[in-house]
């Protein structure tokens, strides 16, 4: 099998998230998506460890390094799948979670020192939100390790960085627009508020004020529909490996909507959940199929 590029880690997160999204409605599909995600996650890890010299060189590029946070994020979500399949082996699932969480922290620290400190800062791209806000996936999955303080800390960090990064990225992109090969990163715009909403629901549950849910839902959905309007422009450029950035943000948006609907219970939202689930699964399957075709041509 051809070496999977580093940006494919976005598809790993997409598979992991999709497996959780349809868990209660399509359990067989959920198992298939999660198992595929876990298998590819392990393969991806071993492949890049055995080719570490080449991988290390690729990680000197800021957009690639910041986007690599999708790998530990996928690991934290997949650890919940491991626990569902092997409930009698909680240490295995928890070990995967801690490995992924610590790797995410290491990526944040390493990237900040190299590319985000004053005097060294490169221009920001949407993948910065994956790196700095994506750590909030720890709040989404914290029940596996049972340390709610981690959930509070990562959720707070995610909120602060979201409101700091959006204006920064907008300002930098006005001066340095995304190159065509990275246009897929525009899909990331809907990820931060969606992840924060899902994590809020996980931590706060029914105790969350309704207005908080509605405000977060409006922000999440606004960015989701903005991303949908950008899809024609992204797709007409032809397939790029960065298309992986179209998968996990849309899946996260559908997941957050579904979790919020579990509390709001508004009839209209049921139809929206169904529509967004179908849309994000189509995007995931399309990108995976395009990747398969792309890899076949490169052999």
Which role does the model predict for each range below?
Residues 1-46, 288:
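N-terminal signal-anchor module of multipass membrane proteins
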Residues 20-29, 82-92, 140-151, 200-212, ...:
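Helix-coil boundary and interhelical linker segments in multi-pass alpha-helical membrane proteins
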């Amino acid at each position: 099998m051809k070496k999977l590029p580093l940006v494919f880690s976005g598809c790993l997160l997409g598979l992991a998230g999709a497996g959780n999204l349809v868990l209660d409605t399509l359990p067989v599909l959920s198992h298939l998506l999660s198992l595929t995600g876990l298998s590819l996650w392990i393969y991806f890890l071993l492949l890049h460890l055995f080719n570490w010299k080449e991988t290390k060189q690729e990680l000197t590029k800021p957009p690639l390094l910041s986007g690599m946070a999708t790998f530990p994020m996928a690991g934290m979500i997949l650890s919940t799948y491991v626990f569902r399949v092997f409930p009698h082996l909680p240490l295995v699932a928890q070990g995967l979670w801690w490995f992924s969480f610590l790797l995410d922290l290491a990526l944040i620290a390493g990237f900040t020192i190299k590319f985000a400190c004053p005097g060294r800062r490169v221009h920001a791209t949407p993948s910065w939100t994956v790196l700095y806000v994506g750590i909030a996936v720890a709040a989404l999955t914290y029940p596996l390790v049972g340390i709610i303080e981690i959930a509070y800390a990562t959720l707070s960090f995610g909120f602060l960085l979201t409101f700091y990064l959006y204006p920064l990225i907008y300002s930098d992109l006005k001066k340095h627009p995304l190159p065509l090969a990275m246009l897929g990163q525009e899909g990331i715009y809907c990820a931060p508020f969606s992840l924060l909403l899902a994590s809020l629901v996980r931590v706060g549950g029914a105790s969350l004020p309704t207005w908080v849910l509605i405000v977060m839902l409006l922000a999440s959905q606004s960015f989701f529909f903005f991303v949908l309007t950008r899809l024609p422009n992204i797709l007409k450029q032809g397939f790029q490996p960065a298309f992986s950035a179209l998968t996990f943000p849309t899946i996260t948006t559908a997941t957050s909507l579904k979790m919020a609907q579990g509390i709001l219970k508004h009839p209209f939202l049921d139809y929206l959940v169904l529509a967004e689930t179908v849309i994000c699964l189509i995007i995931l399957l399309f990108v995976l199929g395009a990747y398969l075709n792309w890899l076949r041509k490169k052999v």
